[in-house]
From Swiss-Prot:
Residues 40-219 form the Helicase ATP-binding domain. It comes from Hamiltonella defensa subsp. Acyrthosiphon pisum (strain 5AT). Its main location: cytoplasm. A motif (DEAD box) lies at residues 165-168. This is ATP-dependent RNA helicase RhlB.
Length: 422
C-alpha cells in the first residue's frame, strides 16, 4: 500500500480481538485506511454502520475484521444447530463472493471459525456439502442463499452479524426483493450487528438501511472526490471507423503491464477480444455467459500475469479486486456514471498511479455530459493523428464457443514502454 492511502491509526490502536490483529499484521498491514479507522469505533462497540466507500478503500477488511471480532467476542447461542450460520455476508456477484471468501480465509488462519460459499452458476453440491457440515460465516449471492434457505439446508434465525456489500449494485441487478425476503427470516435488527457498504448512499440505499438496520451511523470516505487523484484520465473523440484502430494503437503506445478494457455489450467485447488476439496479445474475455469455472480460471490467469488484457462488461467485472492494474480503457462510455466510476476504480488502487483512457465515439459521446456533471470535472481531451494509426492489422479472430475465452501471446519484440508517471 502507498502510505498516502493510510492513516496514522494502527489496527492495534483499536479493541480488535488479538487473533484478528495477529492475522492482519501477519500480512504486513499495520495502519488503517480511512474507512477502517472510521468504521471500527462504531462496529467494535456493537453499533450498526452504513458506509459510503469506493472499492479499493479497504472496506472489505473493515467489515471482515468487524465480523471476526464480533464472533470471537460474543458466544453463539447454545441451542444453535449446524445449519445455522452465525454471520452472513451478501454480495451482488459470485466473483466478489469468491474474493471476499479468499480474504476471509487469510483472516481466519488463527481461529477455528468455519466459512462457506453460496453463489450461483457452479458448485451447487460442493457448496452444499460444506454448509451441511456447519459454517460460522456464510458468504454469497442472494439467489443461491435463498435457494438453500427455501430447501431448509440453512436457517437464518441464529444470525449474529449481517453485512450487505455493494448495496447500490444490489438495486441495479434487481436483488432487493430477494434481500428483503432474507431479512424477514433473520432475528430482529436490534438482535444482530448490521453493516452496509455502498459506493453511494442514495435515497433508496438509505431507505433500505432504515428498514433493516438498528439506527445505523452513516459515514462517508472522501464523498466529494469520486475519482481518485492518483488516476490520470484521458479522453479521445474517434470516428466509428477509427475506433478499433485507435484502441490498438494506444495499447501499442502505452504497452500496459495489466489493463482492463470495458465495453457496453457482450458482442462488442467479443469483437475487441478477436482483434486483440489476432494481433498477438494475451487476452481474457469476461462476459455474463462465460461459465463460472472459466471465469475463475481467467481471473486467476489475469491476476498471475499469464494474461495482460481483460475485456469485460460491467456486470461481469463488478466487484473485481485485481491488484496492479495499470490501465483501464473505456472502449464505450457507459450510460451510468456509477459504472464509469467503478470501471476506472479498477486502476489506481491503494494509492498507486493509474491511467484511464476513454473513447467517446458517435454512439456514446452523449453520455459524457452526465459523467462530467456527476464527477464534477472535465476529462482532459487529447487529439489523435489519423495518419499515425496502425494499419497493418490482421483480420480479427472469431470466438469459438467450445474453446477457452482467451488466447495469444504478447509480441516479445515490441519496443514501446508504458507512459512514465507524471
Amino acid at each position: 500500500m502507498n502510505k498516502t492511502h493510510l492513516t496514522d491509526q494502527k489496527f492495534s490502536d483499536f479493541a480488535l480481538h488479538p487473533l484478528v490483529i495477529k492475522a492482519i499484521e501477519n500480512q504486513g498491514f499495520y495502519h488503517c485506511t480511512p474507512i477502517q479507522a472510521l468504521s471500527f469505533p462504531i462496529t467494535l462497540a456493537g453499533r450498526d454502520v452504513a458506509a459510503q466507500a469506493q472499492t479499493g478503500t479497504g472496506k472489505t477488511l473493515a467489515f471482515l475484521a468487524s465480523v471476526f471480532n464480533y464472533l470471537l467476542t460474543n458466544a453463539a447461542d447454545e441451542t444453535r444447530q449446524c445449519e445455522q450460520p452465525r454471520a452472513l455476508i451478501m454480495v451482488p456477484t459470485r466473483e466478489l463472493a469468491i474474493q471476499i471468501y479468499t480474504d476471509a480465509e487469510t483472516l481466519s488462519q488463527f481461529t477455528s471459525l468455519k466459512m462457506g460459499l453460496a453463489y450461483g452458476g457452479d458448485g451447487y453440491d460442493k457448496q452444499l456439502k460444506i454448509l451441511e457440515s456447519g459454517v460460522d460465516i456464510l458468504i454469497g449471492t442472494p439467489g443461491r442463499i435463498i435457494d438453500y434457505a427455501k430447501q431448509n439446508f440453512i436457517h437464518l434465525n441464529a444470525l449474529q452479524v449481517i453485512v450487505l456489500d455493494e448495496a447500490d449494485r444490489m438495486y441495479d441487478l434487481g436483488f432487493i426483493k430477494d434481500i428483503r425476503w432474507l431479512f424477514r427470516r433473520m432475528p430482529p435488527a436490534e438482535k444482530r450487528l448490521n453493516m452496509l457498504f455502498s459506493a453511494t448512499l442514495s435515497y433508496r440505499v438509505r431507505e433500505l438501511s432504515f428498514e433493516q438496520m438498528n439506527h445505523p451511523e452513516y459515514i462517508e470516505v472522501e464523498p466529494l472526490q469520486k475519482i481518485g487523484s492518483q488516476i490520470q484520465e484521458e479522453l479521445f473523440y474517434p470516428s466509428n471507423e477509427d475506433k478499433m484502430r485507435l484502441l490498438q494503437t494506444l495499447i501499442e503506445e502505452e504497452w500496459p503491464d495489466r489493463c482492463i478494457i470495458f465495453a457496453n455489450t457482450k458482442q462488442r467485447c467479443e469483437d475487441i477480444w478477436g482483434h486483440l488476439v489476432a494481433d498477438g496479445h494475451r487476452v481474457g474475455l469476461l462476459t455474463g455467459d462465460v461459465a463460472q469455472r472459466k471465469r475463475i480460471q481467467i481471473l486467476d490467469d489475469f491476476s498471475k500475469g499469464y494474461l495482460d488484457i481483460l475485456v469485460a462488461t460491467d456486470v461481469a467485472a463488478r466487484g473485481l479486486h485485481i491488484p496492479k492494474v495499470t490501465h483501464v480503457f473505456n472502449y464505450d462510455l457507459p450510460e451510468n456514471v456509477e459504472d464509469y466510476i467503478h470501471r476506472i476504480g479498477r486502476t489506481g488502487r491503494a494509492g498507486e498511479k493509474g491511467y484511464s483512457i476513454s473513447l467517446a465515439c458517435e454512439a456514446f459521446a452523449s453520455h459524457l455530459s452526465t459523467i462530467e456533471a456527476c464527477t464534477g470535472h472535465r476529462i482532459p481531451t487529447s487529439e489523435y493523428n489519423k495518419e499515425a494509426l496502425l494499419t497493418d492489422l490482421p483480420q480479427p479472430k472469431r470466438l469459438q464457443r467450445h474453446h477457452r475465452h482467451y488466447a495469444g501471446s504478447r509480441n516479445q519484440g515490441a519496443s514501446r514502454k508504458p507512459r512514465s508517471p507524471q
